[in-house]
């Protein structure tokens, strides 16, 4: 929708009705000048795909997605890939029970300081490759994953 709007610095989305939206992939990808965005009124109840949603938003410094309902999301591939200025993300309400792909989700989020993944359920995740690659400043908090997910996640926490 706003993909490759490289001059976009901020946007008012308060009048957007996203109630029937199922696909948000690439929505803000490569908005390299985007510094802030308020998505608190987004209704994400029916969304199934959030892959590459913020890919390449290299000027974005923080984002609060605590209002997102992610129960039906299946794909979070490269969701924040290349958000190199991103220091904080509020994912406190993320329910990932149906997600199958988290590969590259935080790849190259080199300024990201901490993540609270307390609601992340990785039972159905098939791919976590490069999930935290190049996240040199990252401290992960409150991780609760399945035994299978723990083995997969441990492999990618230290890259």
Residue ranges of predicted features:
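Negatively charged
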Residues: 1-159
